Amino acid sequence: MRTHYADKVDSSLIDQTITLCGWVHRRRDHGGLIFIDLRDREGLVQVVCNPTESTVFKVAESLRNEYVIKVTGKVHKRPEGTVNPHIPSGEVEIAASDITLLNKSKPLPFNIDEYQEVSEEVRLKFRYLDLRRPEVAQRLKMRSYIIREIRRFLDERGFLDIETPMLTKSTPEGARDYLVPSRTHPGQFFALPQSPQIFKEILMVAGFDRYYQIVRCFRDEDLRADRQPEFTQLDLEMSFVEEKDIQQLMETMIRHLFSTFLNVPLPDPFPRITYDEAIKTYGTDRPDLRNPLTLVDVTDLMKSVEFKVFKEPANNPHGRIAVLRLPKGAELSRKAIDDYTQFVGIYGAKGLAYIKVENIDNGTGGLHSPILKFLPENVIAEILKRTQAQSGDILFFGADKAKIVNESLGALRDRLCADLNLYEGQWKPVWVVDFPMFDREDVGDWQALHHPFTALQETDPEKVIANPGDVLSRAYDIVLNGSEIGGGSIRINDIGMQYAVLKVLGISKEMAEAQFGHLLMALQFGSPPLGGIAFGLDRLVAIMTGASSIRDVIAFPKTQTAQCPLTNAPAQVETLQLETLGLKVSKHRK
């Protein structure tokens, strides 16, 4: 029906007759002429309807916003002073010789141009209207282009795109599984995959030494901000590799994507920091390196002070005291400090002690703080030295269990940087390496920090069992501007080590055989050295397009309560469907 998209209409087509199809974005009457902004997937074109073309003009008079039309006409240069430099077609317009009304539209539930005034739930309910916004359409197009380029990049390097099952077996991977009842096997269930982890390892055992997949994953977890129950991963695995092989390949790919789509050069190589460095310096294993603020540890200075708020965590093996220096922060008001105190409380902090450095040359006389009277002068002097405090700074203190201090001061670091716009540079990628293999809350059960198939830097299974807290993994995460966009590891390919890891996690051989015996069996038939990585594609596209949420780069996202306003899913089903599956709905137990 059409000859061109809007973005292809420019001065090279002057005096040519073309046909466009799309929606009436806006209709305007001006001095006897009717102007129509026609919108399609690629942009806008101005159409001019002259009363001398009586049939065309009559149709144009009847048009309303979002009517679907086909326009045929000749491309003309716009009159002087009417050029629109903001769109590709801005130098020209179409003099309509024919307009066909293809379909009408009901009055809109909201004006597409005024989406800011509409709740997200309403926009998602009428998502087909929300998707007509040019900026939303552009993000989805960018997503398509990025995926296409990723496929090309990997195809050229010998990777095979291999699909893995969507209906699989429930395994303990951290979050809850979405379960699918089997009609043909009453009382038994499939699970939707949280990741293709086990299948891609089995593919390596089978000899497919370079695999990738753009794959949907499903996790029935309590939704935090900007999470989705179903999401898309770039998943890949390689055989006969070490960490550096995977990291170098992925760096090359990310640099290529940023250069191709954003014209942004990223560093070569990406910097690397250890997990321990990240936690101690930034309070998180996902540091935003654009943020110049850092945490300074002062736990050792507080072991002998009389101030219990500091002394107790300093002498607790699981405690920590750290300081966050904010340059020129002494001018913060009492209200601002109270707001930040309330903010860190979200992360479990019981308060937010501070020292304002009003004049560094006057010793303690140049300081202002309610806690000064509790600290010896030599301790205060050392704090100022370690933090490199200057006149006009403020020092914020965190004192509690290390986890609370890290999370609260890490979040405060991000908040201060955002509030005061302290960012240095636009793009700061970093590899985080040397993660602990296991983690636990004080004296709780050990859990795998990544997953139980991650290879360890320790090669002796007995040492792993004896001292699990000392063992580092061969895992690596790639973080960009404070967001983890990818994570992976070298995998265990030795059955003895795999059983040792499972034992630390409290999983017996019998339980392991029942849950993922298919992988354990495969490891015994010549498993090569292997490793891989998975990228959160939604997150990567959101970052590259400047979207504020991953929901903005997903065509039909769920809400934060895991619901779809468009389809009203999830929903009840007919009793007969449940009976066919041998299911009965009981009262929900939280």
UniProtKB/Swiss-Prot annotation:
Q: Where is this site: Important for tRNA non-discrimination?
A: H30, G81
Q: Which UniProt keywords apply?
A: Aminoacyl-tRNA synthetase, ATP-binding, Cytoplasm, Ligase, Nucleotide-binding, Protein biosynthesis
Q: Where is this region: Aspartate?
A: 197-200
As for what it does, the entry says: Aspartyl-tRNA synthetase with relaxed tRNA specificity since it is able to aspartylate not only its cognate tRNA(Asp) but also tRNA(Asn). Reaction proceeds in two steps: L-aspartate is first activated by ATP to form Asp-AMP and then transferred to the acceptor end of tRNA(Asp/Asn).
Q: How does it assemble?
A: Homodimer.
Broad class of enzyme this protein falls into: ligase
Name of the protein: Aspartate--tRNA(Asp/Asn) ligase
Q: Where does L-aspartate bind?
A: E173, R219, H450, R491
Location of this chain's protein in the cell: Cytoplasm
Task: Name the InterPro entries for this protein.
Answer: Aa-tRNA-synt_II, aa-tRNA-synth_II, aa-tRNA-synth_II/BPL/LPL, Asp-tRNA-ligase_1, Asp-tRNA-ligase_1_N, Asp/Asn-tRNA-synth_IIb, AspRS_core, GAD-like_sf
The reactions it catalyses are: tRNA(Asx) + L-aspartate + ATP = L-aspartyl-tRNA(Asx) + AMP + diphosphate
Taxonomically, what lineage is the organism? Bacteria, Pseudomonadati, Pseudomonadota, Gammaproteobacteria, Legionellales
Xref: Pfam families: GAD, tRNA-synt_2, tRNA_anti-codon
Q: Which GO terms fall under biological process for this protein?
A: aspartyl-tRNA aminoacylation
> What organism does the UniProt record list as the source?
Coxiella burnetii (strain Dugway 5J108-111)
